[in-house]
Structure formats: C-alpha cells, structure tokens
Amino acid sequence: MEDKIKHKLRIGWSYLLFLKQRVIHDRLTVSAGYMAYITLLSLVPLITVLLSVLSQFPVFSGAGDTVQAFVIQNFVPAASDAVEASLKEFISNTGKMTAVGSGFLFVASVMLISSIDRSLNYIWRVKKKRRPMYSFSLYWMILTLGPLLVGASLAATSYVTSLKIMDDEIVSSFYRTLLGWLPIILSFSAFVGLYLLVPNKKVRVTHALIGAMSAGCLFEFSKVGFAQYITQFPSYQVIYGALAAVPILFVWVYLCWIIVLIGAEITASLGEFEGWLAGKVSTNILESDIKALTEQQGLIESDSTDPESK
C-alpha cells in the first residue's frame, strides 16, 4: 500500500515537472499577452456583432443589455462600473458606422476566434490545419448560433421566473441558489467546450473535464484576488484617473488568457502519457513551428547567445 502511494506521488511529481517544462517551452505568458492584445482590439466588435444578432429577433428584445450587464458583473471583478461605462460608450459609437465599417467589425471578431483557434492548436501540437471553408463555417456558426443560445437561455430564465411555482419559498430559494452558481457553471462549460471542440485533434472528455475544472477554479480564485487587489491597492485609479479602466481591463484580460492557456496545457499534457511519465517535453513539435512562433511574437534570440555559434 505504501509503495503504491509513493509510486503515485512520483508519477504526480513527474507530471508537474513535465507540465512546468511544457509551459516554459510554449512561452505561455507571451502567448497570453498576444491574445490579450488581440482580445482588446476585437472585444468591442465581438460584443457589437453578438448584440446585433440578438437585436434581429423580437423575442430577444432587451436581451442585449441584460447579457452585457451579466457578463461584466460576473466575469470582470471590481472596477465593473468604469469598465461597463467605457464599453457602453464604445459600443454606442459603433452604431454610427457605415456598412463598410460594420464589415470590418465582423472581420475583427473573426480575428479573435481565429487567434484562439491557432493558439490552442499550437498547444496540442496540431500540424494539420482545418480547411479554410470549414474554419469559416465554424467561426460563422459561433458568431450566429452563440448569441441565439444566450438569448434562448435568457428567455427561458425569464419564463421560469414568471411561473406561479416560483412563489413557493423553498423553490424560490433553490432557484436563487442555482442562479448564484450560474456564472461558475457557464465558465466551466465554456472551458470544456473550448478544450474539446477547438483543437483539430481528438481530446478525451475526462482530460477536458480536468483541464476545465483546473481553469475554472483558477478563474474563480483570480476574480476574488483581483477584486481585492483593485479595492485594497487602488494605484491604477491614482495614476490613471478617469483612464484607469483601460489598464485594469488589459491586466484582467491578460490574467484570463493565462488561465485559459494553463487549462489547455493541462488538458493536452494529460494526453501525452509517454512524455510526462518520462518527464520530458514532447518532441512532436517541429523546429520550424517553434521558429515561426518566436518570429510572430518578436522573441527570436540573437545568434550570439547560442553556445554552439561561439
């Protein structure tokens, strides 16, 4: 019994070492910074596209404001008033754009989804890319069906709330508790879907669940910690004043992408049994892929730092 425990502890330790090497190898913090930059460029266009899709259906009238408020209040800790005011101002300005400008908004939204696709497939060492038509169909489905599913869930929530059975105190208390857990359930479901569907590779459901659970826990802890930091150490407000919402939003988006990519690394590494049992980084990735990634992020080391070149 004791030997089995020691064996499992050794396997667990070797896995943690492998995961650490994998994270360093994949330049996770650099990738998170790149994704945060793309997200900030595409965030307002993406929200605008989602709200415009919802506005096309009378049954979802008013759902856009509800979705926007729910996301900001539950997924952007602290500083939500400043961030919400800035986002609403940006989104209201997009209503003055022409058809050509609206087309660019759609392109910017696709850029974000495409960047997510590339980053996660890199973590999974996927060499075979999806066909362009398939990728476009996938992105189009996300931008159209996504808002409809959100609107449908809001309509269902409103319908359930209006039922007479909700007058019962016990049922009403249970329903409020369920709504309180809704942000956690949504974030966990989003992580599972992300790790299962985005990689162009078969991913085991158990691995995706473990990665999503890890990312979900980190996300909830980071929300509490980030909110405490913002409220207890308001240095951003002192330095930036009215513009404090911009760096606060950037830091939070960067932290979110670190969490998303860590969950992806955990999910992908669990599928590499031979690699992490040996305690080595997977060698499936090509050197050309490494060079392409470093060139993209501007982090190529000079030849003078290469010991073999001396």
Swiss-Prot record:
Family annotation (InterPro entries): UPF0761_bac, Virul_fac_BrkB
Keyword terms of this UniProt record: Cell inner membrane, Cell membrane, Membrane, Transmembrane, Transmembrane helix
Locations listed in the record: Cell inner membrane
Top-rank taxon, per record: Bacteria
Major location category of this protein: membrane
GO cellular component: plasma membrane
Protein name: UPF0761 membrane protein VFMJ11_0098
Pfam families: Virul_fac_BrkB
Transmembrane spans: 34-54, 97-117, 136-156, 178-198, 207-227, 242-262
Family the entry assigns: Belongs to the UPF0761 family.
Membrane topology reported for the UniProt record: Multi-pass membrane protein
